[in-house]
A protein has these predicted regions:
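Interdomain motor-coupling "hinge/lid" segment immediately C-terminal to the ATP-binding subdomain
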Residues: 3-6, 12-14, 74, 78-81, ...
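ASCE P-loop NTPase helicase motor core
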Residues: 20-97
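Conserved RecA-like ASCE ATPase "motif II neighborhood" in helicase/translocase motors
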Residues: 1-31
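Alpha-helix termination/capping residues and helix-transition junctions
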Residues: 2, 41-44, 256
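Amphipathic alpha-helical transducer elements in NTP-driven molecular machines
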Residues: 29-32, 300-304, 344, 359-362
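RNase H-like, metal-dependent nuclease domains and their acidic two-metal-ion catalytic environment used
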Residues: 6, 50, 56-61, 110-293, ...
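Short alpha-helix plus adjacent loop in nuclease-associated cores
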Residues: 81-86, 287-333
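Switch/connector loops and helix/strand junctions flanking conserved nucleotide-binding motifs
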Residues: 16-19, 56-61, 80-82, 270-274, ...
Length: 435
């Protein structure tokens, strides 16, 4: 209209309908800049935003980066001030300095203590903390179910793994030296214990999510499985589509990890990428089975439905080198865009809203590989250990009955079950591996 103003008050510009996804928040933030062009150029001119944050990634935090001064006035005196980063309103801070106790009502004229108790009971704790305590640190705990803390991060052997690996969120297991790009308070944890014998993996695959040239990436994830526990060895990403150099480099990784199956999403290119891989496999003389998979479910639902149960059971082990590589990847990309390509950024921000994550190639390749092992995940690592010990005990009894002297010699040499069978000629392997 051409009007100008000395004081502009914008009330509740952020609501659930316009801030659910990253793209919607960026659009809303761009619209907010229009207010600055209407403001009169005076020293005392001001723009004031009033509202409650809807997500951890609220635009009010972005406005603070544009020299706006945020002031937070929760309904109760916070139990912990650290989540507010020193942004409590001066009037409320004065009440606290004068002896106001934690969880006291800050504005009795508006909300009584009983009223707030009823609201918290009806809304749920997380929603109450967001809408009334204005604490965004817990607001997306349920909305974003894929947490880095549910992963097991350690050095992964390329050829073998223990029978079982135990997760624990003890602070002593927190890996603070690794870079994290997840939600606030979300860290990586190392295993508490490795159990059982080390043996070769039951199966190893390479999951490929192909793409064309442009902003998307062609991603390869190398995954192994033993006793229902999955191990992510390495992840590779390329920005040149499905060129020969990209496909050959992926096959080099397959050779490194002794990959048995190449799993390729056929939605892109209608199977042409799989045919190109078969051509290169013939040239490199690699005996790898090529399988295609087609996704029919919406991407966000498919990724969460695949990864959430596996993470909740702590069945995904990630090599430390993957975390370092993810953080250092795409060094030439602008800092604000680099985050969008990082695997663990995509993982922690993935929710069921369409378009929640702008770039999801890496998390999609990982989920595709994990889904391949879905049926095998019903295997219990602890049950496999029990079965192996039972077989070992039965073999000892049989050995003791057959030849007592030989049995004693093998115990002295601390031979395992496979070595004892080879020594007695009861193994299919003609050449003993224990000599």
């Amino acid at each position: 209209t051409g009007s100008r103003a000395d004081l502009m008050i914008l009330d509740d510009v952020e609501v659930p309908g316009n801030s659910m996804t990253e793209m919607m928040r960026e659009k809303l933030l761009q619209l907010c800049t229009e207010a600055e062009s209407i403001l009169t150029p005076k020293e005392d001119s001001r723009i004031m935003y009033l509202g409650t944050p809807q997500t951890t990634f609220t635009i009010y935090k972005k406005l603070a980066e544009r020299s706006y001064r945020p002031l937070i006035w929760p309904a109760r005196v916070p139990r912990s001030m650290t989540n507010y980063e020193g942004l409590i309103a001066p009037q409320l801070q004065e009440q606290i300095d004068n002896g106001a106790k934690s969880w006291d009502v800050t504005d009795p004229d508006r909300f009584s203590d009983e009223d707030l108790i009823e609201r918290e009971a009806s809304m749920g704790r997380s929603n109450f903390m967001l809408q009334f305590m204005l604490d965004t640190s817990l607001s997306d705990a349920e909305k974003f179910p894929l947490k880095m803390a549910d992963l097991i991060v350690t050095s992964v052997n390329p050829k073998s793994a223990p029978e079982s690996i135990i997760w624990c969120s003890d602070p002593r297991n927190c890996i603070k030296e690794l870079p994290t790009v997840g939600l606030p308070g979300d860290y990586f944890y190392s295993p508490m214990q490795l159990q059982g014998n080390w043996d070769p993996y039951d199966d190893t695959i390479c999951s490929v999510d192909p793409s064309g040239r442009g902003s998307d990436e062609t991603v390869a994830a190398y995954l192994s499985q033993r006793n229902g526990i999955l191990y992510l060895h390495e992840m590779r990403a390329y920005r040149d589509g499905y060129s020969d150099s990209t496909l050959l480099d992926i096959l080099k990784g397959c050779k490194k990890y002794d990959t048995k199956t190449l799993l390729i999403e056929s939605n892109f290119g209608d199977g042409i990428v799989a045919e190109l891989f078969k051509k290169h496999l013939q040239q490199t003389k690699q005996a790898i089975n090529v399988e295609e998979t087609r996704a029919n479910v919406r991407k966000e639902d498919r990724i969460i439905d695949t990864l959430e149960p596996v993470l909740n059971q702590h069945r995904l082990v990630v090599d430390k080198s993957v975390v370092d590589w993810v953080y250092k990847s795409n060094p030439d990309t602008a800092p604000e865009k680099r985050l969008q390509y990082m695997l663990f950024y995509q993982m922690s921000r993935m929710c069921r809203e369409k378009g929640a994550v702008r770039h999801d190639d890496r998390i999609d390749a990982l989920a595709q590989g994990v889904k391949y092992f879905t049926d095998i995940l019903s295997i219990s690592a602890q049950q496999e250990i029990i079965n192996r010990k039972r077989q070992d005990w039965n073999d000892l009894l049989e050995h003791w009955e057959d030849d007592l002297d030989c049995f004693a010699d093998h115990l002295v040499f601390n031979m395992n079950m496979e070595q004892r069978k080879q020594a007695r000629g009861k193994d299919n392997n003609s050449v003993p591996t224990w000599v």
